[in-house]
Amino acid sequence: MKKLLGINDKADINYHKFEVRLAARAVAVRHDGEIPLLHVGEGDYYKLGGGGIEQGENIETALRREMLEETGCSIEILRDIGYVIEFRTEWKLIQISFAFLAKVVREVSEPKFTEKEIKEGFRLRWVNLEDAAGELLNEGTKNYQAGFIVKRDSAILEEALRIIKTDYHGRLF
């Protein structure tokens, strides 16, 4: 899998005491060319669907579970996009996000946000794939976490767009 980006807010830090979190994320395209973005009210930014890989899960299983929970959608994973490593020194966290290109197979239910996500004001919004990068970049500089998420998801989306244009001749459907 191709490394897309390394995000580090401080140089020359000893990371041996940092927690490592693995996550799976998707650019999931619906038949009408829209993708789900999650708006986070607390911080006023957008992010791609996906989340942490739980004990005993593989990356693909975690991604399908997270996309169903956060977007209410069943997905078909088409291929990997790449990975992003974030070094969040304020939180003593190294997060590695594995990103995939997917098709939305069907919309199964409403999102089932966690208590934390509800408290943070998560809201699902469908956005045209071509417009999604603008949504990500227009937001997200209002808190520490958002700065990482916007950089991460923008890199993932940029590579997904490149893959769709070159490998899929601009169309997944």
Predicted features by range, described:
Residues 19-21, 43, 48, 95-97, ...:
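Short connector loops at helix/strand junctions that flank enzyme active sites
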Residues 79-82:
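Conserved S-adenosyl-L-methionine
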Residues 28-31, 102-104:
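Active-site beta-strand termini and strand-to-loop segments that position acidic
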Residues 30-69:
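Conserved Nudix-box catalytic region and its N-terminal flanking loop in Nudix hydrolases
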Residues 44-45, 109, 116-173:
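Nudix hydrolase/Nudix homology domain
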Residues 53-76, 86-140:
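Unchanged
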Residues 1-25, 31:
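Acidic, metal-coordinating catalytic segment for phosphate/diphosphate chemistry
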Residues 25, 34, 123:
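Conserved beta-strand and immediately adjacent loop positions that scaffold enzyme active sites
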